[in-house]
């Protein structure tokens, strides 16, 4: 399933987050390891100062696996279905693991690119790196 994640970097964690991204250790140990870096590269900082990204998650509970990794740096303010569950082939049972080959993530990310500014660019300017 796809989720639209809204989150704020925890106060004082900006440099640590940037270091984890630059060293490619963000999400290390998770089954979704590389996705964390991709999410941060695609994330947008919106006018309400939340970072937003589209997350692919196969867990029965949204972000069950990913949440502890994200919460090390972020306060997750909202996690919502990014599209109609009835239309998700993985979710409705018509095609297990369909999210891996579905184009809905790309479509959602393209839509998200039209909002805010690149999150990493903003994070670098805040940390002066």
Report the location of each language-model feature.
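Macromolecular interaction modules
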Residues: 72-74
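Short S/T/G/P-rich N-terminal loop/turn motif that feeds into the first structured element of a domain
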Residues: 1-51, 56-70, 90-129
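Conserved short beta-strand edge segments in small beta-sheet-based binding/regulatory domains
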Residues: 36, 76-92
